[in-house]
Amino acid sequence: MASPRLENFRRIVVKVGSSLLVDSEAGEVRASWLAALAADIARLHGRGCELLVVSSGSIALGRSRLKLPRGPLKLEESQAAAAVGQIALARIWSEVLGDHGIGAGQILVTLQDTEERRRYLNARSTIAKLLDWRAVPVINENDTVATAEIRYGDNDRLAARVATMASADLLVLLSDIDGLYTAPPAQDPNARLIPVVESITADIEAMAGSAASEFSRGGMRTKIEAAKIATTGGTHMLIASGKIEHPLAAIANGGRCTWFLTPANPVTARKRWIAGSLEPKGTLTIDAGAVTALRAGKSLLPAGVIRVDGQFARGDAVVVRGPDTHEIGRGLVAYDADDAERIKGRSSPDVAVILGISGRAEMIHRDDLVIGPAGAMG
């Protein structure tokens, strides 16, 4: 199968490892390389692409700023180094993107933020708003609070979770290697680069090495795990070398890399997950006008809800039924059961008054809603 073209993707997550961002000898940012990457991002941004960056480097920068000795760090030392490094990392990205007139917004997340549905929706909403404003979200694992038991591993899997959370079309993992090989190339001179992976089989997993460095906690194995997460969520993924300047431009020009392809798209995969994998915690009954609106692809507004049943939290799955009690669809609700009861049947301006905050307009956003064909559900 032919490789896709980079410029054909609408929303792209770019993951930058600490071994690329930080010079391991000097402990400082590789400024010229980062400026070249920022120029690549700006070029895609100027073409209308939406870009997100998942950036490692806070611990590496922190240990440099604090002049810590080389060698492994204890957990509390890593957390303290990250606290210093996060400030430097945010400033660096703000400056290099700002040189191109692009705003940057820092988001620090943990494993729970992408696995617990309420926090997942909060992070997703923040990312969506930054993209609406044409800013670039710069995301990092919150190393100051993450522990060994709740880590990802060099942000590869975090990047994959972010990509699926943001419904990205493509995840680019920039690495110190230009893709997946049939064997570790440093050990086997006959190792071949695999340009396209259509399915992650046991053989593909066996090809993953375990190389890592003091500055980078991950290896090829975590990249394969990331590919599983991304492709299951409907996001294509590629691994490419970030050791060259302008790495995204190199990919766009047909440079060496490995593509992991998925037959799904992010919206389809997400809606399949909502419809088939989540246990509903409650029910929203809606009026006939809302049924018509949902079948036309609209979001569910509080004004169309006539009854709320069950005890659910924000982000839980609920069943949506029409006035005849037949199931219309399922979705992730944006309010908990108590607030949903208070605002049912009310207009958007009323919702802000009732709740005392300017909340979300939708009871269920259309991206979080799966509607079945007329008469097919319930």
From Swiss-Prot:
<feature type="binding site">
    <location>
        <position position="56"/>
    </location>
    <ligand>
        <name>substrate</name>
    </ligand>
</feature>
<keyword id="KW-0547">Nucleotide-binding</keyword>
<dbReference type="GO" id="GO:0003723">
    <property type="term" value="F:RNA binding"/>
</dbReference>
<feature type="binding site">
    <location>
        <begin position="175"/>
        <end position="176"/>
    </location>
    <ligand>
        <name>ATP</name>
    </ligand>
</feature>
<dbReference type="GO" id="GO:0055129">
    <property type="term" value="P:L-proline biosynthetic process"/>
</dbReference>
<dbReference type="InterPro" id="IPR019797">
    <property type="entry name" value="Glutamate_5-kinase_CS"/>
</dbReference>
<dbReference type="GO" id="GO:0005829">
    <property type="term" value="C:cytosol"/>
</dbReference>
<feature type="binding site">
    <location>
        <position position="155"/>
    </location>
    <ligand>
        <name>substrate</name>
    </ligand>
</feature>
<dbReference type="InterPro" id="IPR001057">
    <property type="entry name" value="Glu/AcGlu_kinase"/>
</dbReference>
<dbReference type="GO" id="GO:0005524">
    <property type="term" value="F:ATP binding"/>
</dbReference>
<comment type="similarity">
    <text>Belongs to the glutamate 5-kinase family.</text>
</comment>
<keyword id="KW-0067">ATP-binding</keyword>
<dbReference type="InterPro" id="IPR011529">
    <property type="entry name" value="Glu_5kinase"/>
</dbReference>
<dbReference type="InterPro" id="IPR036393">
    <property type="entry name" value="AceGlu_kinase-like_sf"/>
</dbReference>
<keyword id="KW-0641">Proline biosynthesis</keyword>
<dbReference type="GO" id="GO:0004349">
    <property type="term" value="F:glutamate 5-kinase activity"/>
</dbReference>
<dbReference type="InterPro" id="IPR001048">
    <property type="entry name" value="Asp/Glu/Uridylate_kinase"/>
</dbReference>
<dbReference type="Pfam" id="PF01472">
    <property type="entry name" value="PUA"/>
</dbReference>
<keyword id="KW-0028">Amino-acid biosynthesis</keyword>
<dbReference type="InterPro" id="IPR005715">
    <property type="entry name" value="Glu_5kinase/COase_Synthase"/>
</dbReference>
<feature type="binding site">
    <location>
        <position position="15"/>
    </location>
    <ligand>
        <name>ATP</name>
    </ligand>
</feature>
<dbReference type="InterPro" id="IPR002478">
    <property type="entry name" value="PUA"/>
</dbReference>
<dbReference type="InterPro" id="IPR036974">
    <property type="entry name" value="PUA_sf"/>
</dbReference>
<feature type="binding site">
    <location>
        <position position="143"/>
    </location>
    <ligand>
        <name>substrate</name>
    </ligand>
</feature>
<protein>
    <recommendedName>
        <fullName>Glutamate 5-kinase</fullName>
        <ecNumber>2.7.2.11</ecNumber>
    </recommendedName>
</protein>
<keyword id="KW-0418">Kinase</keyword>
<feature type="domain" description="PUA">
    <location>
        <begin position="281"/>
        <end position="358"/>
    </location>
</feature>
<dbReference type="InterPro" id="IPR041739">
    <property type="entry name" value="G5K_ProB"/>
</dbReference>
<comment type="function">
    <text>Catalyzes the transfer of a phosphate group to glutamate to form L-glutamate 5-phosphate.</text>
</comment>
<comment type="pathway">
    <text>Amino-acid biosynthesis; L-proline biosynthesis; L-glutamate 5-semialdehyde from L-glutamate: step 1/2.</text>
</comment>
<dbReference type="InterPro" id="IPR015947">
    <property type="entry name" value="PUA-like_sf"/>
</dbReference>
<keyword id="KW-0808">Transferase</keyword>
<dbReference type="Pfam" id="PF00696">
    <property type="entry name" value="AA_kinase"/>
</dbReference>
<keyword id="KW-0963">Cytoplasm</keyword>
